[in-house]
Amino acid sequence: MPTGKLRQKPPYAAIMTNSPVTPSTETQQPKRDALYARFLPQEADAPPVEWLIAEGLTDYEEALAFMEARVQAIREGTASELVWLVEHPPLYTAGTSANAEDLLTPDRFPVFNTGRGGEYTYHGPGQRVAYVMLDLKRRREDVRAFVASLEQWIIETLAAFNIMGERREDRVGVWVVRPEKPRLADGSMCEDKIAAIGIRLRRWVSFHGIAINVEPDLSHYGGIVPCGISEHGVTSLVDLGLPVTMGDVDVALGKAFESVFGPRQTK
């Protein structure tokens, strides 16, 4: 993993929004840990979120086209909210804040420019991607609280396997402290990223989502500077010594989702 310093990122670096968000100063914004990280529907009779698990590997361009169509249908009221769980073949994606210098080996895997927020990340077999298509108007029109809720969903999922995932105010995503690894040059504890978040909002309907490393080939991250952060590494559940399957993670994701976002409906 390349070494270096954490670059300063603009606010909402993992978010791209076409929704009318009013900017506020840093002093006005509570820390994400202080936000109420539950995004339940406001209506008591709101329909459950559709929960769909794709089989095999999903082509990335097909996934983008599917999300675009579904978001439009949710906005028009002709489709329900949806969480779609997929795995992709090996690829890199570039968010709206990506720096070309962070793509270290451009010819290693296909590279897709995407409208989500954030920088470069990797998707591939052994990583569970959850595309989250929710209507925030039915919940809360609060982007930072939504990101905190996505982090909470991941944290509660990891807790099912006795893994303590943590937020970091300067880094969106979920992190695991690695006391068994050498400390950083400044003496701080080593931390590895286990889950990434990159979302986009269109008229308050979300798409893109989260990615949790279950058992991907972590060497594939060597072709990028993940999320523009070079001083911390990446890890996975299996890398942490847990013999879990994708099915195990899907069960934990489902239970934690209901805690944070409310009822879901499986097919």
Curated annotation (Swiss-Prot):
One annotated Gene Ontology cellular component of this protein: cytoplasm
An example Gene Ontology biological process: protein modification process
Places the protein is found: Cytoplasm
Top enzyme class: transferase
UniProt-annotated catalytic positions: 227
The UniProt record lists the keyword Cytoplasm: yes
Ranges for domain BPL/LPL catalytic: 77-265
Lineage top rank: taxon: Bacteria
Function: Catalyzes the transfer of endogenously produced octanoic acid from octanoyl-acyl-carrier-protein onto the lipoyl domains of lipoate-dependent enzymes. Lipoyl-ACP can also act as a substrate although octanoyl-ACP is likely to be the physiological substrate.
Record's protein name: Octanoyltransferase
Organismal lineage: Bacteria, Pseudomonadati, Pseudomonadota, Alphaproteobacteria, Hyphomicrobiales
Name of the gene: lipB
